From Swiss-Prot:
Gene3D superfamilies (UniProt xref): Kelch-type beta propeller
The organism's place on the tree of life at top rank: Eukaryota
Domain called F-box: residue spans: 10-58
Protein name as catalogued: Putative F-box/kelch-repeat protein At4g39290
Ranges: Kelch repeats: 118-165, 167-213
Naturally occurring in which organism (per UniProt): Arabidopsis thaliana (Mouse-ear cress)
UniProt keyword list: Kelch repeat, Repeat
Length: 365
């Protein structure tokens, strides 16, 4: 039976079967997903579905997206805005653009971490300036927010976070830490919180905590009376131990973990940790960037789909500030050598507003 011209004019893309629409969406760049999510409720639902993510994975269409949080100073307080890295139209240059979402519903003091295609904003402060246990999640496929189960303890003072095997580990953010609130663990699959056992009460007395997930263990550093303390928790053995001293040196610098290798930016050099010889080695082929802070202070480092992305600020004048970004391709050679080859480096953001580069994340998109 032939379709009449009137029927043809009434036929729309949204009337197609879900399987066919998913097949089309899976082949479209995720750069367009936030805009497509406004087409209809059906599109928004399909874009946020696990089926689409699974289909993209099956087709080999997944990639990492770079999200950058900047903190801007206002007359009375701070506001945090999220940007994503996009390529300019008809150009190979890349720029940071604000995400097409409502203002971030989380406080700039929140702990923020990426798991899969989600960005979790953990804790911070409520509107009445009290500590918050709230957890908000942004789906990077549609740039929509939802609420996750709250923590058991309110944390408002920049809690440190890391991800290991689909679980989010949160430490600090409280003024009075003890064995009941030192570390909380969130299982993203079961959506449940639990506390992690601690070795002793003494480790809770520090402040300025940092936590890193590396080689089936979480590594914690803290400061107390200008003295750093380091502890390692082995997940499968369920026990705490002191890490090797050379490994603990990686906590003082910008760092990230890629395929079970610990990398850091230290004194204008990218280095990786040789866990067999217990030493730090320079990444061969990487050219020093003298424009950065020599110690790496303020440099943000992130695992970007198996490569390293570095971001840093350059103050040109009192008002004008640039944000640089560069991507370094990681190549593992025989005999255990690791090379870092510069893929691109450019200014991705220019502003005359007072702001600070807070963090960088690379969720799956």
């Amino acid at each position: 039976m032939l379709m009449s011209k009137e029927d043809e004019s009434q036929m729309t893309f949204s009337m197609l079967p879900d399987d066919l629409v998913l097949n089309c969406l899976a082949r479209v760049s995720k750069v367009y997903y936030p805009s497509l999510s406004f087409v209809s409720k059906k599109f928004r639902s399909l874009i946020a579905s696990t089926e689409l993510q699974e289909l993209r994975s099956f087709l080999g269409c997944t990639s990492s997206g770079l999200y950058v949080c900047l903190r801007f100073r206002t007359n009375t307080d701070y506001r945090q805005i999220c940007f994503t890295l996009r390529q300019k139209i008809s150009s190979s240059a890349k720029i940071l653009v604000p995400i097409s979402s409502l203002d971030s519903p989380f406080d700039y003091r929140s702990g923020v971490v990426a798991v899969g295609s989600d960005i979790y904003a953990i804790g911070g402060r409520n509107l009445n300036n009290s500590a918050s246990s709230k957890v908000m999640v942004m789906d990077c496929r549609s740039h929509t927010w939802r609420e996750a189960p709250s923590m058991r303890v309110a944390r408002d003072d920049f809690p440190s976070t890391c991800v290991l095997n689909g679980k989010i580990y949160v430490i600090g953010g409280c003024k009075n830490l003890d064995s009941t609130n030192w570390i909380e663990v969130f299982d993203t699959k079961t959506q449940t919180w639990e506390f992690l056992q601690i070795p002793n009460e003494e480790v809770c007395r520090g402040f300025n905590y940092k936590i890193v997930g590396y080689k089936e263990a979480i590594h914690v550093s803290s400061l107390e009376n200008n003295r750093a303390t380091f502890m390692t928790y082995e997940i499968h053995k369920g026990r705490w131990r002191e890490p090797h001293l050379s490994l603990s040196h990686g906590f003082h610098f910008s760092n990230c973990v890629i395929e079970n290798v610990f990398y850091r930016y230290s004194y204008e050099m990218l280095q990786w940790y040789d866990s067999c010889r217990k030493i730090w080695k320079n990444l061969k082929g990487f050219v020093r960037r003298s424009i950065m802070n020599p110690r790496g202070e303020g440099v943000k480092m992130v695992n970007y789909g198996g490569n390293i992305v570095l971001l840093w600020e350059e103050c040109v004048t009192i008002k004008k500030k640039l944000i640089w970004c560069e991507e370094v391709v990681i190549e593992k050679k025989h005999q255990g050598e690791i090379w870092g080859l510069l893929k691109w480096s450019d200014v991705v953001f220019i502003t005359d507003e007072k702001n600070q580069l807070v963090r960088a994340l690379a969720p799956d998109v």
